[in-house]
Design a protein with these regions (language model features):
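Context-gated lysine
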Residues: 3, 19-20, 66, 107-110, ...
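Phosphoinositide-binding peripheral membrane targeting modules
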Residues: 51-109
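Anionic N-terminal interaction surfaces
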Residues: 1-64
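Canonical pleckstrin homology
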Residues: 98-130
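Hydrophobic alpha-helical membrane-spanning segments
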Residues: 29-46, 66-68, 72-75, 80, ...
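Low-complexity, intrinsically disordered/propeptide-like segments
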Residues: 16, 37, 48, 52-54, ...
Length: 130
């Protein structure tokens, strides 16, 4: 029989997973092409929260994923790279997908939603980085 978690336990587990992913990406170098693309959109990756980053899977863009910008926007990005690891012209996508995330601080029976938990983790990590 699987263990049933309370809403508070589920929230704590989700928040811990978000922190773990964010800390993992903050501890590793991100592709220069992604840094440059983010900078061109006014996003400093050192203060952003990388939620997902995939690199060079067959039949997929060379770099793609999701992040939460320092100003609270959820972004989906993707780009193909040339042999010098620069974005190929016309291959860069940078889309604000914030509308897809529920930012409710509390929903009856469900607690804080994923988008709100991401924002809390972003604030916590950026406070501790100062």
């Amino acid at each position: 029989m699987s263990k049933q978690y309370s809403v508070q336990q589920q929230i704590a587990l989700t928040q811990a997973a978000i922190k773990k992913t964010a800390a993992w990406w903050r501890a590793r170098p991100l592709p220069d092409a992604l840094r440059q693309c983010a900078a061109s959109h006014g996003v400093t990756l050192d203060a952003a929260l990388v939620l997902d980053l995939q690199l060079a899977w067959p039949d997929m863009p060379a770099v793609y994923g999701k992040l939460l910008s320092p100003d609270g926007h959820f972004i989906h990005f993707e780009m193909d790279l040339d042999d010098d690891l620069r974005p190929l012209p016309g291959s860069v996508a940078w889309d604000d997908i914030s509308a897809r995330y529920d930012l409710a601080a509390h929903k009856r029976g469900k607690g804080a939603r994923y988008g709100e938990l991401c924002k809390q983790v972003l604030q916590e990590l950026n406070r501790s980085a100062r």
